[in-house]
């Protein structure tokens, strides 16, 4: 966020008659269910697109614009208890094969590419998802007798998996936005990951969605619908 020049952005909006635009730090969080036969995922951007909308997603209002400065691609897991989903979500920055071999089912998420276009003009192309793969350190070997092996990663989502978008790109609520994830092969469903903490306790997650997290600025009333 430190690279953004607020004064320059406000000057650009004033130059097109939008001096009343309010700029605030903001995020978009977009997810889609994993489909075992699908290699292309088109993330829905707007609040008005409800086909795949879930309660935890953050979408763009049609009256606003979003200026993206950093972006991350993740696998989204849902906490399960006795095989039943709880609605509690966690993001994965890699396929945790140290926990379960079937994690390789979604490993190709990090072998794809991202394309972003606005009104059919491509502003981001061939952006490899390998940039977003982050494999953290975990404690496999016991350093003292009786200490449990911990396979719980220390993901810090303010940094981990996020990559700067330079130059920044702008999505508009009044335009046709396309955020497309392209994979070499389909990623399979049915991956259940069990994570062990250093006390030996386990937590289970079902990997069932792909996620795109964007951070940047929201320009309230910045779209062409507003004067």
Predicted regions and their residues:
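Beta-strand-centric surfaces of beta-sandwich/beta-rich domains
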Residues: 1-227
């Amino acid at each position: 966020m430190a690279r953004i020049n607020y004064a320059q952005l406000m000057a650009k909006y004033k130059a097109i008659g939008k001096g009343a635009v309010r700029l605030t730090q903001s995020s978009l969080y977009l997810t889609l269910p994993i489909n075992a036969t699908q290699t292309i995922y088109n993330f829905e951007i707007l609040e008005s697109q409800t086909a795949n909308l879930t309660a935890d997603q953050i979408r763009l209002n049609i009256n606003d614009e979003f200026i993206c400065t950093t972006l991350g691609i993740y696998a989204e897991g849902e906490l399960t208890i006795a095989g039943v989903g709880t609605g509690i979500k966690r993001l994965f920055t890699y396929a945790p094969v140290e926990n379960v071999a079937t994690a390789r089912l979604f490993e190709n998420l990090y072998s794809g590419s991202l394309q972003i276009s606005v009104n059919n003009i491509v502003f981001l192309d061939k952006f490899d998802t390998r940039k977003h793969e982050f494999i953290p350190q975990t404690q496999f070997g016991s350093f003292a007798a009786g200490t449990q092996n911990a396979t719980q990663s220390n993901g810090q989502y303010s940094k981990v998996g996020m990559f700067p978008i330079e130059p920044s790109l702008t999505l508009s609520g009044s335009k046709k936005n396309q955020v497309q994830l392209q994979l070499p092969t389909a990623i399979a469903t049915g991956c259940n990951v069990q994570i062990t903490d250093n006390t030996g306790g386990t937590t289970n997650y079902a990997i069932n969605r792909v996620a795109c997290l964007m951070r940047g600025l929201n320009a309230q009333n910045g779209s062409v619908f507003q004067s």
